[in-house]
Amino acid sequence: MTEKRNQNQNIAVRFLLGVVLLVSTPLLQATTYTTGINPGEWKTVSSVFECRLEQPVPLFGDIVFRTRAGEASGAYLRSKTARFAAGDAAMVARTPVWRPKQESINLGAVAMKQGTRPLWLGSKRAELMLSHLSDGREIEISNPAWYRESPEARLAVTTIGFRHEYSNYLSCLAGLLPANFDQLRRTAVYFRNGDAEYLNATARSHLDKIVTLVKHDPKIQKFYIDGHTDTVGDRADNLELSKLRAELVSQYLISKGIPAEQLVIRWHGERYPASSNGSWDGRSKNRRVTVRLEKLEASQPNTKPANSMAGVDPPK
């Protein structure tokens, strides 16, 4: 009787173990996020300020290739919730399942963070990914999942619909502005010793970029023009020299279509050096005019006359 009871218990245990294995085995497989053979839904978001090429991935989020005006390209993942654990993820380029199988190309390890922006790649990696996608290869990124029930999470970036939108993305890149607001919001142009009558090619190029940006961004409505000098010469003469430099830059901007009423012109002489006046290099950095841009939402009412006297307020 005891022997029969033990046999029944062994059968029950084996049955339960079998049920556990059947239930747990799928959970131990890698979780793959992909559009599969469905339309990839690639889309291009275009403006003169930024170009983005995006693919939404069901249950994951998006893979985004982005280039801002004046900057190098990049790529990042945008997920709805954390899907990957932190650590080095593997990235490969592979042939889609519907094409003759070829050996996958190892694109190296990429640093993954846990969170909703787990991955950011610089220009070199982003352009490499775009090149493989354009050639018809998928990109697969794999790393341990952040939750224990799945040993690995994989993201497959598909090529379906890619080439058409990639062409639109390239067209957008051709129309980007030469620089963005963050790059130009505080610009300095420099002068030769004692000079306040000549803007060299580099100075004109910087100012022209500002003009081009402003023509496409109506929110930029305030310009603070601050003139400076080094300490060579008389203090009073330097104050006048900084005024002439600030006025020269202001007149150039006005000649390019910037409304004069949007300019706040100030001059400070040698009061606010950007570098030490004890060296030639330092003095060359102090002979400058800075142009600071402000957007409408960030601007404060200006209660001072446009040609405010030097030294009343330090340049911001």
Residue map of PLM features:
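N-terminal signal peptide c-region/cleavage motif recognized by signal peptidases
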Residues: 24-25
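Bacterial N-terminal signal peptides that target proteins for export
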Residues: 3-16
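Extracytoplasmic/secreted proteins, especially bacterial periplasmic and envelope-associated proteins
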Residues: 128, 202-209, 240, 244, ...
